[in-house]
């Protein structure tokens, strides 16, 4: 079985897509179409930053999708079509939208606009600097919930995603998430990583 899984938010970084754009006209076309759809030079933001702007949800989501779609187009340029060769496509959170676009369920333009709208809605729900997320590695749901309860201290700190039997994501107030990262080892959790969201 061949499966293609697309990344979710938190996988963005300044410099993403630069080598693809330099090496492939198909990748440049993807970045150009997304820029046009958003009336923004997102490709430049992806290439040069600043990181603080790229990490904003309204920018990060379409940027991650554009980068993944550029990879898909480079594969297609080489004769490897995901919709034909893959048995399935999937994505982690926002990657689900990329998966749909990669097999033609959504157009690239519509996906970029949808993710911009989704990103703005998510950003507006929690003002910048108020919320945060962390991934807990080596944590089951029970340990993650106990850590969230200990870290909350009157603030919000909740289990957000149960990714697999050994990885859970917490979200909540920034201070509570910072406490969770500090307390993780005391709760028998191998590692806690604050996510760039």
Question: Which residues fall in each region the model found?
Answer:
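Residues that mark the start of a beta-strand
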Residues: 1-2, 132
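Helix-rich "cap/lid" substructures immediately adjacent to catalytic or cofactor-binding pockets
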Residues: 2-90, 170
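Alpha/beta catalytic cores of group-transfer enzymes, especially the acyltransferase/condensing modules
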Residues: 9-12, 36-38, 103-197
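Patatin-like phospholipase
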Residues: 17, 28, 41, 65, ...
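A short small-residue
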Residues: 47-54, 98-99, 194-196
């Amino acid at each position: 079985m061949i499966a293609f899984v697309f990344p979710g938010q938190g996988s963005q970084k300044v410099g993403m897509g630069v080598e693809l754009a330099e090496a492939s006209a198909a990748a440049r076309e993807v970045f150009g179409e997304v820029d046009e759809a958003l009336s923004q030079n997102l490709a430049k933001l992806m290439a040069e930053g600043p990181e603080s702007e790229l990490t904003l949800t309204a920018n990060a989501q379409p940027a991650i999708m554009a980068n993944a779609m550029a990879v898909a187009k480079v594969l297609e340029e080489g004769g490897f079509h995901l919709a034909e060769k893959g048995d399935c496509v999937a994505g982690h959170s926002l990657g689900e939208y990329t998966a749909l676009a990669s097999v033609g369920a959504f157009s690239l333009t519509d996906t970029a606009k949808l993710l911009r709208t989704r990103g703005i809605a998510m950003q507006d729900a929690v003002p910048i600097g108020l919320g945060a997320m962390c991934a807990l590695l080596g944590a089951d749901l029970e340990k993650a919930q106990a850590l969230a309860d200990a870290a909350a201290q009157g603030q919000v700190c909740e289990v957000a995603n149960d990714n697999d039997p050994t990885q859970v994501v917490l979200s909540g107030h920034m201070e509570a998430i910072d406490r969770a990262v500090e307390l993780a080892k005391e709760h028998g959790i191998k590692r806690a990583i604050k996510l760039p969201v």
